[in-house]
Design a protein with these regions (language model features):
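A Lys-centered signature of the CheY-like receiver
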Residues: 120
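Conserved phosphotransfer cores of two-component systems
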Residues: 54-60, 84-90, 112
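Short, glycine/charged-rich "phosphate-handling" switch motifs in NTP-dependent
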Residues: 115
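Active-site residues of response regulator receiver
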Residues: 67-68, 98
Length: 151
């Protein structure tokens, strides 16, 4: 399906590096996706925000979390594990966005419930592939099949 989203995506960026946050914003703008962006720099605040989203009395927008593995205090794996244990976590599409090209990290996080794994590239143009991945997930991800009328 390649139609515009009728409901903006909720994108939660859990990233403590301001340069990477800037690049993610750049990618989202370049791909002209409708989105609401929430930038959070640690796992505890991200979990608090997810709890707040669950409490809101409004239709749920498709939610994508772009999660770095290396965070202060608790790492991204801990947050992924926690998100996947709560009922609201099953509605969140989690994309690991990391500098780790280690196959063991990829296998482990996908086994833990991440929906995709994106290695931060060295070249700016390659970062645009993250936008393609988000578009693919927004339009075709089975996590939101029941809400196809809203995307």
């Amino acid at each position: 399906m390649d139609t515009p989203l009728s409901t903006p995506l909720t994108i939660i960026v859990v990233e403590d590096n301001p340069v990477d946050v800037y690049l993610i914003r750049w990618v989202l703008t370049a791909h002209e996706l409708p989105y609401t962006l929430h930038v959070i720099d640690n796992a505890d605040q991200a979990m608090h925000y997810i709890d707040e989203l669950a409490q809101q009395d409004r239709p749920k927008a498709p939610t994508i979390m772009l999660l770095d593995l290396t965070l202060p205090q608790r790492d991204g794996r801990d947050l992924l594990r926690q998100v996947r244990t709560i009922p609201e976590g099953s509605d969140i599409c989690v994309v690991i966005v990391t500098s780790s090209n280690n196959p063991a990290d990829r296998r482990e996080t996908l086994r833990m419930g991440a929906d995709a794994y994106f290695v931060k590239p060295f070249h700016l143009n390659e970062f645009m592939q993250l936008g393609n991945l988000i578009k693919h997930l927004a339009f075709d991800h089975p996590r939101w099949e029941d809400s196809a009328s809203t995307v």
